[in-house]
């Protein structure tokens, strides 16, 4: 069997308080800090900052 990878599933939550989120993976070894990325929020129809949150 293959070895378990370093990538962990994360959720990117919109800072516009719309409840919209994206899911993605991230390599914990290369990026130990919390991820912040600007992406499109279709609820407000603007690009806003998305912050990392844990998937429950």
Curated annotation (Swiss-Prot):
InterPro entries on file: Ribosomal_bL33, Ribosomal_bL33_CS, Ribosomal_bL33_sf, Ribosomal_zn-bd
Ribonucleoprotein recorded as keyword: yes
Keywords: Ribonucleoprotein, Ribosomal protein
Domain of life: Bacteria
GO annotation terms (biological process): translation
Short name of one Pfam family: Ribosomal_L33
Gene Ontology CC annotation, any one: cytosolic large ribosomal subunit
PROSITE patterns documented for this protein: RIBOSOMAL_L33
Gene3D superfamilies: Ribosomal protein L33
UniProt GO molecular function: structural constituent of ribosome
Protein family membership: Belongs to the bacterial ribosomal protein bL33 family.
The protein's name in its UniProt record: Large ribosomal subunit protein bL33
Organism per entry: Haemophilus ducreyi (strain 35000HP / ATCC 700724)
Gene name for this UniProt entry: rpmG
